[in-house]
Design a protein with these regions (language model features):
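Alpha-helix initiation/capping motif
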Residues: 4-6, 30-36, 135, 154
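Long, compositionally biased intrinsically disordered terminal regions
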Residues: 98-169
């Protein structure tokens, strides 16, 4: 889950996030089983949102509510050997504001509702990040410019979450 923060709309609740590219205002909330269970205890039993492999309906509802404090996006990216797929959707002010969009690099990479694109810059996550104002500048794409290429797996991202400072006794 990607969160876009701003000084105008600070988040009400502290979440276990990882800061992304400097000055981007973007943080990543790795959706590990533990984190999902802490924010949506029923998510393990929830069906996925239509079209998505792993976005549980309860997590989508939680994202919708979180978007009252700033933009929220769900990103799913799977690539191996230059081929793969993206799925993305974003919420703003309590409603779906962008997507969902499902893209793949070739036919057969994902289910039939995924559009095949020939330019990686047209993959769903890149398109959504452009909608948020991320510019690729000299990077290969917006995914890399945002700092999302730093880790490949959710657990790698979770290991980057800064531990909470100890509380005074």
């Amino acid at each position: 889950m990607l969160l876009k923060t701003s000084e105008q709309k600070p988040r009400r609740a502290a979440l276990p996030t990882v800061p992304l590219a400097a000055d981007s205002g973007l943080v990543l909330l790795p959706l590990t089983e533990e984190i999902v269970a802490s924010v949506v205890p029923t998510a393990a039993d929830d069906p996925p949102v239509d079209g998505f492999y792993e976005l549980a309906t309860g997590v989508a509802e939680w994202a919708r509510r979180q978007s009252m404090d700033g933009d929220v996006a769900y990103l799913h990216s799977e690539f191996f050997g230059g081929g793969g797929f993206h799925a993305a959707m974003a919420w703003r002010d309590g409603a779906v504001a962008w997507g969902p969009l499902f893209t793949a690099t070739s036919d057969g990479e994902a289910e039939d509702h995924y559009a095949t694109v020939t330019d990686l810059r047209d993959m769903a996550v890149n398109v959504m990040l452009r909608w948020w104002g991320v510019q690729r500048a000299d990077q290969i794409d917006e995914f890399t410019a945002a700092g999302l290429s730093r880790c490949r797996w959710t657990q790698e991202w979770a290991a980057l979450i800064a531990p909470e400072p100890p509380t005074a006794v």
